[in-house]
């Protein structure tokens, strides 16, 4: 951004609670292991986020206030609000004994017991509560908000400019959150069976959106947590989000990637391409036109930017599925853009051209629905 210019119409929300110290974890003084890092390492990693000139609301314990403020450049202090919380101040704390009992009686079978302790799971389930409180406080009078894990920029250091671009692209009525695989409501079935295993459905390092959409998402997540506790369960944040997403597709702006690609894939696909392709195929099969369009579009940009190199069949499907989804969504002019683009690439790349020719009869029958003689003629002569 130019000096004196501020285009950030959003507030970033994050948090730090030293649960290892709180629970007197037997590994709390270990320098680092495969399950978590100690506070010194954590804060060094968080410096990349804290050095960004973005309005932030940060939830933490009293003893970490000064340390966090010291990581923010002095010129950004007026864009920083620290909210101090004791554990007893956390939402639903009176339910934690029941949650702990559930944790012991109904363990998640494929999670590390060293990392995913009861209090750790409780804290990560507070993300939506922190976002809710930040929205209600709204100290910077912004219209959009976003949760970001403190260390996420270590994986991909997304700039302020790119962050602004991402926020500007999120529809007012949707929440952008990263999914790793498609979840159909039928998969959930018995909540107890679904929550018995973590299924790697969501990478919850970031979720972003406008005030009302986020509040609705937070409400749904709170409701799902409370029902789960009442049924003797103790899911993680990502498990709860996967259920909320499956049952509320119309609230979700789809974004695909593993945790390492949560930020990297925001503007276009750069990694976890296999996850995105699988998600695209499933969205298309399920007739989820909006998800199909958005996932295909992210992959399309990745191909055009030469950030990814899918197979010829996958490239064809990215454009074809994008066309079909937009046809059903009523975006007919964009359908033409997609088809002209597919024709141009097929004319330039022999293997893709051969693939299109092998599908020509079927493709022409689909293109005919547009009633555009120029496009039909081009593909007929390819």
Per-region residue spans from a language model:
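Catalytic core and acceptor-binding pocket of nucleotide-sugar-dependent glycosyltransferases
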Residues: 154-158, 175, 195-279
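"A position-specific structural signal for the A-helix of alpha-solenoid helical repeats
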Residues: 278-281, 317, 321, 359-363
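Flexible helix-coil transition and linker loops at the boundaries of alpha-helical arrays
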Residues: 302-312, 347-354
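GT-A fold catalytic core of metal-dependent nucleotide-sugar glycosyltransferases
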Residues: 119, 123-177
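TPR/TPR-like (Sel1-like) alpha-helical repeat modules
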Residues: 335-350
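N-proximal low-complexity "stem/linker" segments adjacent to membrane-targeting elements
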Residues: 1-41
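Active-site-proximal specificity loops/subdomain of glycosyltransferases
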Residues: 77-137
